[in-house]
UniProtKB/Swiss-Prot annotation:
<comment type="function">
    <text>Required for the formation of axial filaments and for anchoring the origin regions at the cell poles in sporulating cells, thus ensuring proper chromosome segregation in the prespore. Binds in a dispersed manner throughout the chromosome but preferentially to sites clustered in the origin portion of the chromosome, causing condensation of the chromosome and its remodeling into an elongated, anchored structure.</text>
</comment>
<keyword id="KW-0963">Cytoplasm</keyword>
<dbReference type="GO" id="GO:0030435">
    <property type="term" value="P:sporulation resulting in formation of a cellular spore"/>
</dbReference>
<dbReference type="GO" id="GO:0005737">
    <property type="term" value="C:cytoplasm"/>
</dbReference>
<keyword id="KW-0131">Cell cycle</keyword>
<protein>
    <recommendedName>
        <fullName>Chromosome-anchoring protein RacA</fullName>
    </recommendedName>
</protein>
<dbReference type="GO" id="GO:0006355">
    <property type="term" value="P:regulation of DNA-templated transcription"/>
</dbReference>
<dbReference type="GO" id="GO:0003690">
    <property type="term" value="F:double-stranded DNA binding"/>
</dbReference>
<dbReference type="Pfam" id="PF13411">
    <property type="entry name" value="MerR_1"/>
</dbReference>
<dbReference type="GO" id="GO:0030261">
    <property type="term" value="P:chromosome condensation"/>
</dbReference>
<dbReference type="GO" id="GO:0007059">
    <property type="term" value="P:chromosome segregation"/>
</dbReference>
<keyword id="KW-0749">Sporulation</keyword>
<keyword id="KW-0175">Coiled coil</keyword>
<feature type="coiled-coil region">
    <location>
        <begin position="75"/>
        <end position="156"/>
    </location>
</feature>
<keyword id="KW-0132">Cell division</keyword>
<comment type="similarity">
    <text>Belongs to the RacA family.</text>
</comment>
<feature type="DNA-binding region" description="H-T-H motif">
    <location>
        <begin position="3"/>
        <end position="23"/>
    </location>
</feature>
Length: 184
């Protein structure tokens, strides 16, 4: 019987039963979960204690029946295989969690390495692009300088030609009109 069942049989609270067991060092056994487990003999002893208390005996002066055995500790029940199975399951879960934590650590390290490599590649790409742009700018500047020098040469040579061309046009004034002139 558990504490609640004994308490209801005696008509007291479960806390009262627990207090009597502790203060009087009664022979109640405990199961693997730490709960009291009472036998029929334990219930008789508790009824005797209840009777003495109701008669006004102080808790220190209560006499226990001689049949009361000494407390033997925890009661080992047949659930040891269940307990072993549960322990095994918990150990498996612990192993799984430890493995997951290790895997997580490895993944985090791998992600950090990949981020570092990606950053390095990005830096290299930007550097390459900057160099390529610099080369293109240098090529464009060279072409611009070449075009500028060619333009200067062209403008220097074209000025005398334009002056000579303008002089020629002055001398040839109205050559077609002379052909169509009517003689009068």
């Amino acid at each position: 019987m558990n504490t609640n069942m004994v308490a209801s049989e005696l008509g007291v609270s479960a806390k009262t039963v627990q207090r009597w067991v502790k203060q009087l060092n009664l022979p109640a056994e405990r199961n693997e979960l730490g709960h009291y487990s009472f036998t029929a003999e334990d219930v008789k002893v508790l009824k005797s204690v209840q009777k003495q208390i109701s008669e006004g005996t102080a808790i220190q002066d209560i006499h226990l029946p001689k049949s009361a055995k000494k407390r033997t500790g925890f009661l080992v029940q047949k659930t040891s295989s269940d307990t072993e199975r549960r322990i095994e399951q918990l150990e498996q879960k612990l192993d799984t969690l430890l493995q997951q934590r290790q895997d997580e650590s490895e993944l985090m390290a791998r992600m950090s390495e990949l981020e570092r490599q990606l950053k390095q590649k990005a830096d290299e790409g930007v550097s390459y692009q900057l160099l390529q742009h610099r080369r293109e700018i240098d090529d464009i500047l060279a072409d611009l300088q070449s075009l500028t020098s060619q333009m200067k040469e062209f403008t220097a040579h074209s000025i005398p030609e334009t002056a000579a061309a303008s002089e020629k046009t002055k001398t040839r004034k109205k050559p077609l009109l002379s052909l169509f002139k009517f003689q009068t």
